[in-house]
Amino acid sequence: EGVEATHAERARRLRIDDLVCVFDGIGRSAAARISEVTQRPLQVHLVIDHYEHWPPPATRIHLVSALPKGDRQATMLDMATQLGMTDYTPLRCDRSVSQARVQTYDRWRRVLIESCKQSHRPWLPVLHPSVDLKDWIAQCAGTNAVNVIADKGGGTGDQAIENCLLNAESVCLLVGPEGGFSDTEREHLDEAKSEMLALGDGVLRVETAAVALIAFVGRLLSSDGSPP
């Protein structure tokens, strides 16, 4: 019912006996047939044929990034989800140009759902509250997560990152604002156990860096036999 029923009946023009695939966002999907469509309120009734349960990703890919402006936020989350992002945390930085608001999360969740549909990913990414860089580093100190930071001063090779990813249960990908991290923030980063990775010679937009970083790490995980 609700938004999904409207999309099915009016946008996709699905009718009785049409076949659909539905998912719950926590690993379960189902093949179903439309058995009835009622109006006021609009509801689409389904008959489930069979269920499938998909295990969670072997390695969680957690994007922690400064927010780009406006519609670029949705673009970033859309592409990141298609590439295998499992978690997202907005990062508050000294040079951030945008901040997450309560109503923003509702819009982001809709983007994530549509992206999972597009890419046939049965696990919906988890949205976390925004956090300061210093607090994030403190949170990571007690975990076994691998931290990879997009930075022009980092390395460019695969081997160092690939070695860190061996048997990793979670990898956190940090992307700062387009103005870069402040000197104070860089001091905090120096204290953290992390790998710096250069994504090119130019200054990338936040969403470009985030997507490039996820694609890079996802490829390494896949080549190691661990699907992103």
Kindly give the residue locations of the regions a language model identified.
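Fold-independent oxyanion-binding glycine-rich loops
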Residues: G2-V3, G25, L67, S130, ...
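Glycine/charged-rich beta-loop-alpha catalytic/anionic-binding loops adjacent to active sites
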Residues: G2, A58-H62, S170-C172, E191-L199
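Structured adenosyl-cofactor binding patch, chiefly the S-adenosyl-L-methionine
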Residues: D183-P228
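Active-site/ligand-binding-proximal alpha/beta "capping" segment
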Residues: N147-R186, S194-A198
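RNA substrate-binding interface of SAM-dependent RNA methyltransferases
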Residues: Y51-I149
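Hydrophobic side chains in well-ordered alpha-helices
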Residues: A8, Q73-M76, E185
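N-terminal positively charged helical leader segments and presequences
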Residues: E1-H53
